[in-house]
Amino acid sequence: MKVAVVHDWLTQIAGAERVLEQILAIYPEATLFAVVDAVAPDQRGFLAGREVHTTFLQKLPFARRHYRHFLGLMPLAIEQLDLSAFDLIISSSHAVAKGVLTGPDQLHLSYIHSPMRYAWDLQHQCLRESGLERGVLSWLARWQLHRLRIWDQRTANGVDHLIANSGFIAGRIRKIYRREATVIYPPVDVDAFAPGAPGTRSGDFYLTASRAVPHKRIDLIVDAFAQLPTRRLVVIGDGPELKRLRQRAPANVEFLGYQPVTVLRDYMRRARAFVFAAEEDFGIVPVEAQACGTPVIAFGKGGVRETVIPLEAELAAASRSVAVGGGRGVAPRGDAGAAT
């Protein structure tokens, strides 16, 4: 049986790439495809030396670095991949990978990390954050997203079996595509994030860790700690928002930028609690924190509702608020005080 694995774009190692790594481990002889491949040489270990077959976008100027600017061309690009020689196609999709063309004698399984939120429920937020609420460019962007929604919904019908990474995403698939999906949670290496030796939890700080991008809502956490000057927050992660976050942060917030997993794990083991404000599709990092025995304070929406056990005194906030801080928390070892 010939197997093809199709991923949206290869530019970094995040949750979707961890899933891809496990799919490739299950099918070591599979051929790998992606819209573009721009993973740095020192981060390609998860590909296990595989050649990546890309689309015509790989050859366009600036496409590997500014691949998101070519979103309007990606449906066309993904449809140009010739997969007719394969029996099984597995797409790992949060954008366009599920749109590959397949025939009646081929089986197409698609692991959906999320439908394209920037084209659906987050369109207005994304346009606002990009400064595209008004003007000619705004209308061009809205037209492009409109076309993308039509294509996205149509191509969902070409998938034989949809797989969601959480019940939350299965609900979104049901809403957008009007199809049912099997839930298979992403892999989390909980053994690597086991609790430290007794007495490890000696830190006087709270921790958050993620890419510094708007939807992770690190800004909300920073603003919350601005109102808690006696509590220290450590932020791990790099991204385009990091400079702006540093400029608005109070003295009790420390930014460490990108750190290797060994450093992240050490901070997780020592933190009083892990703080998480994103509405994530699944949310791997809160699971890693809990594997370290660290309490989690989380915004009570998204995949975190399937991985974090709420305290009895949970604040059931329907929206994010610095003043209320509504969320969910789990307090392993009975340390309820760390999640209040």
Spans of features found by a protein language model:
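Short hydrophobic beta-strand element within catalytic cores of glycosyltransferases
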Residues: 295-298, 305-308
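Conserved donor-binding/catalytic core segment of Leloir-type glycosyltransferases
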Residues: 196-216, 222-228, 233-234
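Nucleotide-activated donor-binding/catalytic signature segment of Leloir-type glycosyltransferases, i.e.
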Residues: 243-266
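Carbohydrate-associated surface elements
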Residues: 168, 187
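Acidic donor-binding loop of glycosyltransferase active sites
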Residues: 269-281, 294-295
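Active-site donor-binding segments of glycosyltransferases and PAPS-dependent sulfotransferases
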Residues: 26-98
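Membrane-proximal helix-turn-helix segments that form the acceptor-binding/catalytic region
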Residues: 129-162, 170
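Short glycine/serine-rich donor-binding loops of glycosyltransferases
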Residues: 283-287, 304
